[in-house]
């Protein structure tokens, strides 16, 4: 890696950019400047710069080292050594930890050319209310970084293979002598030729530019379990992005977004429904049909039922995702009063009121019967 390159500027992102923002910028620019697509004289060099920038900023350890020293050259952070400069010890950030870590305990760190699992991905899946209750089988499509089909992930041109790095002899790291406030010290850093892989690619694959990865459309069959709720997620192992140095694929997390129902409310495995009945049904009792997600069922309404009374329909709710059985449906009744009555209905109610000792007052329109008999 060349010194004094502004990798953030190359990718067109800010220094506080998230990992996702860096990845998106890399994908966009690598496609834009790919030599097979862009025939501009400087396209190949820009393509190399973009890949070089992502090799650093796309790796948290390499990015931290780059941010610490301000360039790809770790010596740049010391500004010529000594205690000079504007900040003294503060100029080094976490430098002492890195120095002593590599000098005394560097062997405990993970090797940079060790296989690493690929990135995890998220997929938002919209479900209808009933689909979340009963589950469904579907196929989803999404874009992911996969192993290059041309080189099989090696990054080398077809017919060639990566060779052991001539600079680090396959270790992925090199020893660098640095001038520090404590004198000259030797520290270990990622090899700038193979970028920590231990392998050197003499002729890069024209499809992926030596990264071993390309953006590909991917399909996967999904079985949505019955009883899922809004916001819950399901993990599909190995359906994320390709790994590094022979590492496994990452995972895919499907996040469910359940659409609300016009008829029902849901709380876990319990379903709630509002049912209207007439004041005659409430007074005399009746057997009515109530809709459920499982189909219509009969419900006996006892005589004298009041507005706000709740009934429970056993087993007519949603399946319990964790545990056995199914929840219930709760039916809350609302007694409705007609706004207009014909003469026969009015006379019948007057007789009912008289028999009940509730003769209408006849004064104004404040009485119960006056509200719907006039």
From Swiss-Prot:
Indicate which residues the UniProt annotation says bind Zn(2+) 1: 148, 151, 205, 208
Q: Look up keyword Zinc and say if it applies.
A: yes
Q: Which GO terms describe its cellular component?
A: cytoplasm
Q: Which residues hold Zn(2+) 2?
A: 165, 168, 191, 194
Q: Which GO terms describe its biological process?
A: chaperone cofactor-dependent protein refolding; DNA replication; protein refolding; response to heat
Question: Which segments constitute the J domain?
Answer: 6-70
Q: Which Pfam families match?
A: DnaJ (PF00226), DnaJ_C (PF01556), DnaJ_CXXCXGXG (PF00684)
Q: Per the record, which residues fall in region Disordered?
A: 308-328, 347-374
> What keywords are assigned to this protein?
Chaperone, Cytoplasm, DNA replication, Metal-binding, Repeat, Stress response, Zinc, Zinc-finger
According to its UniProt record, where is this protein located?
Cytoplasm
- What InterPro entries does this protein's entry cite? DnaJ (IPR012724), DnaJ_C (IPR002939), DnaJ_domain (IPR001623), DnaJ_domain_CS (IPR018253), HSP40/DnaJ_pept-bd (IPR008971), HSP_DnaJ_Cys-rich_dom (IPR001305), HSP_DnaJ_Cys-rich_dom_sf (IPR036410), J_dom_sf (IPR036869)
Q: Which SMART domains match?
A: DnaJ
Q: How is the cofactor bound?
A: Binds 2 Zn(2+) ions per monomer.
Names of the cofactor(s): Zn(2+)
Family indicated by similarity: Belongs to the DnaJ family.
Domain note for this entry?
The J domain is necessary and sufficient to stimulate DnaK ATPase activity. Zinc center 1 plays an important role in the autonomous, DnaK-independent chaperone activity of DnaJ. Zinc center 2 is essential for interaction with DnaK and for DnaJ activity.
What this protein is called in its record is: Chaperone protein DnaJ
Please name the taxonomic classification of the source: Bacteria, Bacillati, Bacillota, Bacilli, Lactobacillales
């Amino acid at each position: 890696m060349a010194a004094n390159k502004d990798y953030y500027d190359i990718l067109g992102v800010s220094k506080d950019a998230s990992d996702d923002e860096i990845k998106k910028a890399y994908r966009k620019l690598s496609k834009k400047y790919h030599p097979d697509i862009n025939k501009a004289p400087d396209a190949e060099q820009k393509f190399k710069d973009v890949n070089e920038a992502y090799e650093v900023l796309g790796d948290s350890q390499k990015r931290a080292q780059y941010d610490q020293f301000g360039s790809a050259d770790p010596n740049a952070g010391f500004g010529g050594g000594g205690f000079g400069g504007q900040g003294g010890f503060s100029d080094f950030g976490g430098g002492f930890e890195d120095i002593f870590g590599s000098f005394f305990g560097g062997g405990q760190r993970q090797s940079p050319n060790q296989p690493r699992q690929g990135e995890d991905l998220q997929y938002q899946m919209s479900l209808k209310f009933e689909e979340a209750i009963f589950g469904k089988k579907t196929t989803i499509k999404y874009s992911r970084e996969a192993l290059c089909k041309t080189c099989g992930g090696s990054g080398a041109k077809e017919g060639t293979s990566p060779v052991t790095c001539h600079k680090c002899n396959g270790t992925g790291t090199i020893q660098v002598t640095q001038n520090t406030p404590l004198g000259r010290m030797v520290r270990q850093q990622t090899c700038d030729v193979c970028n920590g892989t231990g392998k050197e690619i003499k002729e890069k694959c024209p499809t992926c530019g030596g990264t071993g990865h390309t953006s590909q459309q991917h399909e996967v069959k999904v079985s949505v379990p019955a009883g899922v709720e809004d916001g819950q997620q399901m993990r599909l192992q190995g359906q994320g992005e390709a790994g590094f140095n022979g590492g496994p694929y990452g995972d895919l997390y499907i996040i469910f977004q359940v659409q609300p129902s016009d008829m029902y409310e849901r709380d876990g495995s319990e379903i709630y429904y509002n049912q209207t009945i007439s004041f005659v049904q409430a007074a005399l009792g009746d057997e009515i049909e109530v809709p459920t997600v499982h189909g219509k069922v009969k419900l006996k309404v006892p005589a004298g039922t009041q507005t706000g009374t709740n009934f429970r329909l056993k087993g007519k709710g949603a399946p319990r995702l964790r545990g056995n059985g199914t929840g219930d449906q709760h039916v809350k009744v609302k007694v409705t009063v007609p706004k207009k009555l014909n003469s026969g209905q009015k006379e019948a109610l007057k007789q009912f009121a008289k028999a009940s000792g509730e003769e209408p007052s006849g004064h104004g329109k404040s009485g119960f019967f006056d509200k719907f008999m006039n």
